[in-house]
Every structure is written in structure tokens, then in C-alpha cells.
Amino acid sequence: MASMKRKCPDDETACGSGAGAAMCVTGCGFFGSEATNNMCSRCYREHSADNDAVEEAAAANSDLELVGVAETTTKKARMSAVVPVAVASSSSAAAEQPAAKAATAPNRCAACRKKVGLTGFKCRCGGNFCGGHRHADAHGCGFDYKSAGKEQIAKQNPLVVADKLATRI
């Protein structure tokens, strides 16, 4: 029975490796199989992912070409209507840009000019204040809280008054 064992050649790393076990064709040092085109599992995965990406790009490219042809014909027909609208929207966008900058500018306390960033407190008088000046008496607020409170209560609690009857008195 000892004579039936086969001796390992010097170039093989394990005894019993059959004809199906060959080194990976990419030269990474692992064994490949015929099912994976003589590549190891890692190299085969990378190779198939690359092929899939190339096929998807080609498919997307052909779709874009078909869509591009259809779009150019419709764009030529609509070009005269689109140009005046684009000019009007660009002028309105230019007018909105300074207003947007002015809205983001108050990052400082209105009383002491200290940077407040996101931690600032907005008052009803319209100012942005730090923690020390957030109360109305600390920054000399001109907002009339008393009348605003009265108006708010009047809106929330409407007075129910019955109509006077002419026959009754």
C-alpha cells in the first residue's frame, strides 16, 4: 500500500493537486480553476465587475445617443420659446442673490457685535443677539410685548356675543 502513494514534485505545493489546479493567470499567487477562467476567486470577481461596468457604460451610452437624437429635434422646435424665458429667469435670479446674502449676513450680536453663529437668539424686534443680550431689557428692545400678547389672546379666544333681538327688550 505504501507503494501506491504518489510522490510530490518540487514545483507543486501540495500532494494530490490534480490537473484542474493551476496558478492564477494574473500572477497573484493563488490557485485558479477552469470554472473561473484559470483565475482565483478574487481576480475573477474583479474581472467580472470590470466587464459589467464596461457593459453598463456601453448600454447607457447607446441609450443616451438615442435620447440625444430625439432631444435635438425637439430642442430645435422649442428654441425660440425657451430663449426669452431663460433671459427673464436669469435677471430674476440676479436680483435674488443680494437678498440671499443679506439674509445670511447677521452672524453677530446686534448689541456687542460678538460672533454668535448658530447659537444666536433672534428677537421679535428683528435683531440677532448673543446669550448676554438675548433678553429684551438687556438690549433695549423696542418691541411692545404687552400689546402683542393682548392681540394674540384676542385671536385665540374670540368673544361670543349674541345678536340683539328687536322684539325683545
Swiss-Prot record:
Gene Ontology MF: a single term: DNA binding
Q: Which UniProt keywords apply?
A: Metal-binding, Stress response, Zinc, Zinc-finger
The answer to whether UniProt assigns keyword Flavoprotein to this entry is: no
Q: Which SMART domains match?
A: ZnF_A20 (SM00259), ZnF_AN1 (SM00154)
| Binding residue positions for Zn(2+) 2 | 109, 112, 130, 133
* Zn finger limits (AN1-type): 103-149
Q: Which residues bind Zn(2+) 3?
A: 123, 125, 139, 141
Q: Where does the chain cross the membrane?
A: none
Q: Which stretches of the protein fold into A20-type zinc fingers, per the record?
A: 18-52
Recorded protein name is Zinc finger A20 and AN1 domain-containing stress-associated protein 7
Annotated organism of origin:
Oryza sativa subsp. japonica
Q: Which gene encodes it?
A: SAP7
